């Protein structure tokens, strides 16, 4: 979790105990290029801390992909619709290259932070 922890601690004061709690609640995952981490009109129930690689978030509007953001090493991706409004995602999130990420249940993320 080197890149994730470095990004977090560069932005916020994070205790060693908090980092350990996070480590205890994540699962290491490997995703191939073009993998759909999050799909529109579905619940994901998870957030992903990106250790290595890059993702793209986008909407599908009249058959056209509209990119809304990119996330890279040290970043986090999740469905804001799901986390904040408890509704299915309106966005897709796909990997732009092979990605190593740490997956955490949204319920655990809320509980921890």
Q: What annotation goes with each model-predicted range?
A:
Residues 27, 36, 54-59, 76, ...:
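Short beta-strand segments in beta-sandwich/barrel cores
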Residues 37-42:
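Short phosphate-coordinating micro-motif centered on Lys-Gly-acidic
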Residues 59, 64-67:
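Compact nucleic-acid interaction/catalytic patches
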């Amino acid at each position: 979790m080197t890149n994730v922890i470095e990004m977090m601690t560069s932005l916020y004061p994070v205790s060693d105990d908090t980092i350990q709690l996070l480590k205890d609640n994540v699962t290491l995952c490997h995703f191939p290029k073009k993998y759909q981490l999050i799909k529109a009109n579905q619940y994901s129930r998870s957030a992903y801390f990106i250790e290595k690689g890059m993702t793209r978030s986008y909407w599908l509007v009249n058959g056209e992909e509209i990119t809304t953001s990119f996330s890279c090493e040290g970043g986090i991706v999740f469905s804001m619709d799901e986390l904040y409004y408890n509704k299915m995602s309106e966005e897709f999130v796909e990997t732009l290259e092979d990605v190593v990420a740490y997956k955490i249940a949204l319920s655990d993320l809320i509980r921890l932070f």
